[in-house]
Amino acid sequence: MSGERETAGRSSTGPPNSTKSSTYFSKIAQLISKLYPRARKIVEIGVGRSPHALLQLRSLLMEAEIVATDIDPEAVKELNQMGIKAFIDDVFKPNEEVYEGADLIYFIRPPSELIPKLAELGRKVGADVLIIPLSEDEYFSDLSGWDRLEEDGIIAYLLRGSSPRIGSGL
């Protein structure tokens, strides 16, 4: 069971995302910057070795603290060497201090088994949670309480938390 959990908690945004175009990640960053133009802190979970959206977001929201997390220590080490504030973290046993004060927590292409954990984490720290699925998979169609967003070809689902600091641009 622990092997399954470890695999489930691993980033799904490592090598598979490297096949996505930079335009795809740019569109994600644009969407987030429109939704959270006054964010003070945003955390991407499961960055892996594909920090493309995060890097774009840093340039769009220069006043915000942009943080990355991943379960893979080597990926986190590489992110830190790139000047990205990154932490080793497991969504199944999150270090809530990493997420405290976040306006938004997001995950690009999360495995379905992580979605309830992401929602729980968002509730605990008072942050909104945004997920960008690989495709319009069936398990995304029945997310009670989540808003479906579509912008410039990007489909996302947003679960609003209790963060009073956000200023939605959409």
Annotate each predicted stretch with a short phrase.
Residues 113-169:
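C-terminal substrate-binding/active-site "lid" region of AdoMet-derived donor-dependent transferases
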